[in-house]
């Protein structure tokens, strides 16, 4: 048990033979799909890949030595189906290829709880529904496995039809290498809501907006765009690495006294109580399903809003400056 009372499960807590004794169909061969499939195979698990006939990933999966079937064929053949296509595509893939090929005793696994949490997918009775969600992108999941390390994960049980779903989740987590680092049990609801909040308020949305505003403030005050880029974006990795290694305290210990003092007196003025209130509103939209409904509605109508927002973000001046600088310096090659 950890000091905060949350149990961290490691390799000694899992029986790898459970996942080795079933056929796993990995549906999708993108970031998580390719990493989890390769790691499972290297752990002695029988894996087939399910991809549409026109999928751009078919050749990559075949070149990696996998048997590649159509999604419905893979789902019918396997006892555990790992659905690793992007969230917006999962409903259609489930309805067209998986739903009618599930048998009692099968297991349906996700690496994000979005479609279960918001009711876009409702698996039938008699089927285990579980989640193993690595806390890192696919290339990291694969790289850490090959380096005899692991990427931490969370896991959850939504429906334990077989009575062995908990053990199966841990076995799968061990198969992809996650238990080398450790896994924490959660729920589909907790994983989905906290993951979306982290992405929107801090890791992606909040951080990107903070970087852009910092860049704009310096450039509008007359400083060189290149210098502004270094100060508010490039050096961010140095700080993030310190935080990941040893928490906020290691970052504070490692920076200069000037920087540390400035962070205390100025940080709360930038990220003030109004920011926290806005964060609470965002969390409320996530918990109520408002965000999910907006996202899926836009996706279903052609992703017009998403496309427009992506194009606007790509036109920000920091992108051109960054591309030019990265082309000049050896650290980007």
From Swiss-Prot:
Residue positions binding Mg(2+) 2: 195, 231, 235
Catalytic activity: (2R)-2,3-dihydroxy-3-methylbutanoate + NADP(+) = (2S)-2-acetolactate + NADPH + H(+); (2R,3R)-2,3-dihydroxy-3-methylpentanoate + NADP(+) = (S)-2-ethyl-2-hydroxy-3-oxobutanoate + NADPH + H(+)
Binding residues for NADP(+): 29-32, 52, 55, 57, 87-90, 138
Annotated keywords: Amino-acid biosynthesis, Branched-chain amino acid biosynthesis, Magnesium, Metal-binding, NADP, Oxidoreductase
EC annotation from Swiss-Prot or TrEMBL: 1.1.1.86
GO BP: any one term: L-valine biosynthetic process
SUPFAM superfamilies found in the cross-reference section: 6-phosphogluconate dehydrogenase C-terminal domain-like (SSF48179), NAD(P)-binding Rossmann-fold domains (SSF51735)
Residue span, KARI C-terminal knotted domain: 187-332
Listed cofactors: Mg(2+)
Cited InterPro entries: 6-PGluconate_DH-like_C_sf, KARI, KARI_C, KARI_N, KARI_prok, NAD(P)-bd_dom_sf
Domain KARI N-terminal Rossmann, residue spans: 6-186
A Pfam family that the UniProt record links to this protein: KARI_N
One function term, GO molecular function aspect: ketol-acid reductoisomerase activity
Record note on cofactor: Binds 2 magnesium ions per subunit.
Record: residues binding substrate: 256
Active site: 112
GO cellular component: cytosol
UniProt-annotated binding residues for Mg(2+) 1: 195, 199
Function: Involved in the biosynthesis of branched-chain amino acids (BCAA). Catalyzes an alkyl-migration followed by a ketol-acid reduction of (S)-2-acetolactate (S2AL) to yield (R)-2,3-dihydroxy-isovalerate. In the isomerase reaction, S2AL is rearranged via a Mg-dependent methyl migration to produce 3-hydroxy-3-methyl-2-ketobutyrate (HMKB). In the reductase reaction, this 2-ketoacid undergoes a metal-dependent reduction by NADPH to yield (R)-2,3-dihydroxy-isovalerate.
Family affiliation: Belongs to the ketol-acid reductoisomerase family.
This protein's name: Ketol-acid reductoisomerase (NADP(+))
Originating species: Tropheryma whipplei (strain Twist)
Gene encoding the protein: ilvC
